[in-house]
Amino acid sequence: MVKTEICGKGSSQGSEEERLSQLPDHLICVILSHLSTKDAVRTSILSTRWRNLWQLVPVLDFDSRELRSFSEFVSFAGSFFYLHKDSYIQKLRVCIYDLAGNYYLTSWIDLVTRHRIQHIDISVFTCSGFGVIPLSLYTCDTLVHLKLSRVTMVNVEFVSLPCLKILDLDFVNFTNETTLDKIISCSPVLEELTIVKSSEDNVKIIQVRSQTLKRVEIHRRFDRHNGLVIDTPLLQFLSIKAHSIKSIEFINLGFTTKVDIDVNLLDPNDLSNRSMTRDFFTTISRVRSLVIRHGTIKDIFHYMELEPLQQFCYLSELSAVCSISNLEMLLNLLKSCPKLESLSLKLVDYEKNKKEEVMSSTVPPPCLVSSLKFVKLESQLLGCGTELKVARYFLENSTILEKLTLKIDYMYKDEANVNHIRQTLHAVPRCSSTCEVVIHSLLY
């Protein structure tokens, strides 16, 4: 939503207004559609040319905070729904900060679902409960993009969303597990799914089964009773952020899928959980592009203490967030990536009470000798020098490295410190004679 102010006209503002006024009505309506409805109405005072253009905008955007009282908000929004009761509405966005709005929300959604609505974005922020989505939304045959935040989706017998391509659920409460299953399975052209949720609902096992989904993001607080099933053969991108999850099952996950994993398994060393852990690592070992974080790296290390880690034979691109106390764990992972070509490594200090590890493996991982071409290091540390040690390790041990990039996010007092880092790295003996070293830093 864009905030705008109508000010007095100066000469430059007048000329800009004249240029805008020369545009055809449909282009002006496109511009107005990027404003809130309240701000779009305010443009009517610009000139007689603009007086009624806001009425042609097929986008309704309401926020109850923009009015002095909730009753004033209901009156303001209601007048627009009455104005559009017989016309096309392309997009509806409603943000409500009063639970009393649930009654009006139902009637508004019922109205727009009868008028070829394509985009719906509903958010209800109250401390006493969630707004309830009416039944009409579950059978809207023109809806393309649905975004819901802090609402309740009830159990329904019939769901039909034939045009829905993007589904974004942010802290949505489901009355039972079948509701989410029905919505996904009854959206035959669904391509993108995002679920952000706490563990406090009635969905214990999230099942994502779709023949059309290309992008899935699950960011959820799981507990020891929760699980996840992914069955999406056409998936191109998968992001899972979950803590203390009981089980994860992948079905038909293609090796071309880019996977972003931030998962803490309950206990990879638990015998009852080891089979699931093995299957989990076996599946992600087949992908070509992988993003992992500190917790997952630790799980991999603990798993490797019990049995050998599967080889990531297809992996060519790896991005990792790694604590400086777990650098040896990272090296052990790299030993299972024989064809890795690109490594992006972000150094953090999550475990401040633990000693920093030095990458001192006498035998470098095979990928450093045969395949690794690009290394990007990013540091948010306060000048402890770890990034220099890591950079030195890759420069001294990577046979065919083409480029090493060091990005430093912390503040340096002067250019001299950056020059010192640059000179230090350029003085490091390089195993690859063609390797280029690039340093990016922010000076304040």
Swiss-Prot record:
Residues 356-408 form the FBD domain. Keywords: Leucine-rich repeat, Repeat. LRR repeats lie at residues 103-123, 124-150, 151-171, 172-197, 199-224, 226-252, 273-299, 300-321, 322-347, 369-396, 398-423. It comes from Arabidopsis thaliana (Mouse-ear cress). Residues 17-63 form the F-box domain. Signal peptide: none annotated. Transmembrane segments: none annotated. Pfam families: F-box, FBD, LRR_At5g56370. CDD domains: F-box_AtFBL13-like. This is F-box/FBD/LRR-repeat protein At5g53840. InterPro entries: F-box-like_dom_sf, F-box_AtFBL13-like, F-box_dom, FBD, FBL13/AtMIF1-like, LRR_dom_sf, LRR_FXL15/At3g58940/PEG3-like.
